[in-house]
């Protein structure tokens, strides 16, 4: 995905809504589920983790799997008829998956490298995809006890450690110098070349989907991403961004569940 998430003025054309009933009680249950998964992750946080390498060379730990099982069980109990695609799911036949009109898209532990480094910048991502677009996104940051929630067309909010609910919105104007976020684990030469054309900027390295949320809450201006990334890495963050009013000269809202391999 080669999209730059730069906030400027609120976007008006994003009106996606879910065909699944999402009242406040359902959204609260989803928040609780993300936070339960976060607690499962934190139960491993201070331990020396055994790390396995997946086929794509990314790391896998017991914390990834504990969060995965927590979320899978919770979503199946909440909405048994809605399929779930998780990063840690067993492979699902592409023909079957591409026929889904509505499904959950989950990254049970985004930022496993950040988890292993114990820097607190890892997240739990839960998104509802409806007709290829995210209509709801929940990004929970377990180590910070912060949960970002975005319902496209209905706004975004943050639940902080004090459980206070605060509406979030992108800043109306980019700052000078531009506040830019980059990946802590995946720096690229393309990013360096891109930033040469952006004028004055201050770069901050941040892990996981927390970067999306930083732009959504207005504490950063730009998150450029170059190279491939998986759909479960971006779906929940995209929903939070859109709900918070993101727009950009280069922002392209990614459509999900349209290709046989979930990479965008």
Model-flagged regions — what are they?
Residues 41, 64, 75, 112, ...:
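Residue-level signal for inorganic ion chemistry
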Residues 126-213, 222:
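Acidic beta-strand-loop-alpha-helix segment within the catalytic core
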Residues 1-32, 193-197, 212-264:
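Oxyanion/phosphate-interacting regions
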Residues 100-144:
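Glycine-rich active-site/cofactor-binding loop and its immediate structural neighborhood
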Residues 86-88, 207, 252:
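Short loop/edge segments at beta-strand edges and connector loops
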Residues 2-109, 193-196:
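N-terminal subdomain of lithium-sensitive/metallo-dependent phosphomonoesterases centered on the IMPase/IPPase/PAP
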């Amino acid at each position: 995905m080669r999209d730059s998430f730069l906030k400027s003025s609120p976007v008006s054309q994003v009106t996606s809504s879910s065909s699944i009933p999402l009242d406040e009680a359902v959204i609260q249950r989803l928040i609780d589920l993300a936070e339960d998964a976060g607690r499962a992750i934190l139960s491993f946080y201070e331990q020396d983790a055994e790390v396995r390498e997946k086929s794509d060379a990314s790391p896998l730990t017991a914390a990834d799997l504990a969060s995965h099982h927590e979320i899978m069980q919770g979503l199946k109990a909440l909405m048994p008829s809605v399929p779930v695609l998780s990063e840690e799911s067993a492979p699902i036949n592409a023909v079957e998956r591409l026929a889904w009109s509505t499904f959950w898209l989950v990254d049970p532990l985004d930022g496993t490298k950040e988890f292993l480094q114990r820097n607190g910048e890892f997240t739990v991502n839960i998104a509802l995809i409806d007709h290829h677009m995210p209509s709801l996104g929940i990004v929970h940051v377990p180590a910070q006890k912060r949960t970002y929630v975005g319902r496209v067309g209905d706004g975004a909010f943050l639940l902080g450690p004090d459980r206070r609910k605060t509406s979030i919105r992108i800043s109306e104007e980019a700052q000078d110098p531009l506040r830019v976020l980059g990946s802590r684990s995946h720096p690229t030469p393309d990013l360096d070349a891109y930033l040469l054309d952006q004028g004055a900027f201050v770069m901050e390295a941040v892990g996981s989907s927390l970067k999306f949320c930083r732009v959504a809450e207005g504490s950063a201006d730009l998150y450029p991403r170059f190279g491939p990334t998986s759909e479960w890495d971006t779906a929940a963050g995209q929903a939070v961004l859109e709900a918070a009013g993101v727009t950009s000269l280069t922002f392209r809202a990614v459509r999900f569940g349209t290709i046989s391999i979930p990479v965008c």
